[in-house]
UniProtKB/Swiss-Prot annotation:
Chain ranges passing through the membrane: 29-49, 54-74, 86-106, 114-134, 153-173, 177-197, 200-220, 221-241
MF term (GO), any: proton-transporting ATP synthase activity, rotational mechanism
InterPro entries linked: ATP_synth_F0_asu, ATP_synth_F0_asu_AS, ATP_synth_F0_asu_bact/mt, F0_ATP_A_sf
Family: Belongs to the ATPase A chain family.
The entry's keywords: ATP synthesis, Cell inner membrane, Cell membrane, CF(0), Hydrogen ion transport, Ion transport, Membrane, Transmembrane, Transmembrane helix, Transport
GO cellular component, one term: plasma membrane
CDD domains to which the protein is assigned, alphabetical: ATP-synt_Fo_a_6
Complex and partners: F-type ATPases have 2 components, CF(1) - the catalytic core - and CF(0) - the membrane proton channel. CF(1) has five subunits: alpha(3), beta(3), gamma(1), delta(1), epsilon(1). CF(0) has three main subunits: a(1), b(2) and c(9-12). The alpha and beta chains form an alternating ring which encloses part of the gamma chain. CF(1) is attached to CF(0) by a central stalk formed by the gamma and epsilon chains, while a peripheral stalk is formed by the delta and b chains.
UniProt cross-references to Pfam families, sorted A to Z: ATP-synt_A (PF00119)
Protein name, per record: ATP synthase subunit a
Length: 241
């Protein structure tokens, strides 16, 4: 792994299981760290709200801050109508955040570095928003494909462009998240490998530089969870407004 910065993204089997309908369903490192991320989220929420104190402790305050943060994102982008969709938006945010942060830890695996994972998340969001759109607005939901005031002669072209833009939303969401996680981790691995090979890791400047890079990657991990969530809310606003 020290020689190949992309080795950290390799999926390998942890527990081999019998094939199911011809498909390999073995328990992989990706499954393991996804499970770890979910368990950490559950523990964070359970212990955070366990006491329900009027004057919250540090953990309860952290849970309340994350929850209020997600609510503010929803309100700012969808208005009050979007608040009924808090369960989905909060789950998406906290899951991606947990996976991203776990991936920063040494010898871990970044689940969100694989497009298949981020695309699955994006498709869940895409299908959910589409269903909500038709449920809330009916056929009127299709008006997002044709802005008001569009000349009739231009309408067919605009509809095709808007339909294409709508259908590629899950693709852009998934690639944006995966690409940013891959890029950040690869840069850290390349620089860290160079420093180790030069035998200068424990000198002050390179060591502090690596720490700063890891700190920046933590920031990117949080930022990417925020961007995914805010884009989800922007797309949701088309369905509820």
């Amino acid at each position: 792994m020290a020689l190949n910065p992309l080795e950290q993204f390799k999926v390998y089997t942890v527990i081999e299981l019998p094939r199911l309908f011809g498909y390999d369903v073995s328990f992989t490192n990706s499954s393991l760290f996804m499970m770890i991320s979910v368990i950490l989220v559950i523990l964070f929420l359970l212990f955070g709200i366990k006491k329900g104190a009027v004057i919250p402790g540090y953990l309860q305050a952290a849970v309340e801050y994350v929850y209020d943060f997600v609510i503010s994102i929803i309100e700012n982008n969808t208005g009050s109508k979007g608040l009924q969709h808090i369960p989905l938006i909060f789950t998406v945010f906290i899951f991606i955040l947990s996976c991203n942060l776990v991936g920063v830890l040494p010898y871990s695996f970044t689940v969100t570095s694989h497009v298949i994972v981020t695309f699955a998340l994006s498709m869940v969001v895409f299908i959910y928003i589409t269903i909500v759109g038709f449920k809330e607005r009916g056929v009127e939901f299709l008006r997002i494909l044709l802005p008001k005031g569009t000349p009739s002669w231009l309408a067919p072209i605009i509809i095709i462009i808007k339909l294409f833009a709508y259908l590629v939303r899950p693709v852009s969401l998934s690639i944006r998240l995966a690409a940013n996680m891959i890029a950040g981790h690869t840069i850290i691995k390349v620089i860290a490998g160079f420093i180790v090979n030069m035998n200068i890791f424990f000198t002050p400047a390179p060591f502090l530089f690596i720490i700063a890079l890891i700190g920046f990657e933590v920031f990117v991990a949080i930022l990417q969870a925020y961007i995914f969530t805010i884009l989800t809310c922007v797309y949701l606003s088309d369905a509820v407004k």
